[in-house]
Amino acid sequence: MKCKHCNGSIEVTMGRRPTYCSGKCRQAAYRLRKEEARGSIPKEMAEARRWVRCDGKVPTGKDGRRLQWSKEENWLTFMEAKNADYGDGFGFIMGDGFGVIDLDDCFEDDGSLAPLAARVLEENPGAWAERSVSGQGLHVWGRMKHAVGYRQEGIEVYSFGRFIRVTGNEFQAGEVVLPELWV
């Protein structure tokens, strides 16, 4: 019999058939499954209990009704949000040092990056960027001090008191530990 993780041999004994050759392989396989489940979403975000389900851009509860996303008791772990069978997606509640730069109309007609989007990505190396729900915008994720959100010249910046729909449609790979964002 072979270990499901390392393919090493497992000694067959009486009782339940073992799947892994050791506790170390069982733990490594668990961590790998967890990492695969989060896809491209940075580990630091996936580990934060700041997720909710949503329909479109509206946070939604199990009953299908609009959710009060500002109440912590309504927040989920990433895996709970990802695996829930209601709503059509999930989002992240800003706060606790997480920030996002929300950019609209990021692509030129030829598919190249618009100058503003290119500048923001250049100024934030290591930040994780995903395409927005429309596919035309970008969310640039990182760490940010608690500050009032603002909208200016095609840029929206938020670090608390806001819900952002997450697509997981990676545009720029980021660090496992998110960097400080610059606007």
Q: Predicted regions span which residues?
A:
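Conserved phosphate/metal-binding and DNA-contacting active-site motifs used
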Residues: L32-V183
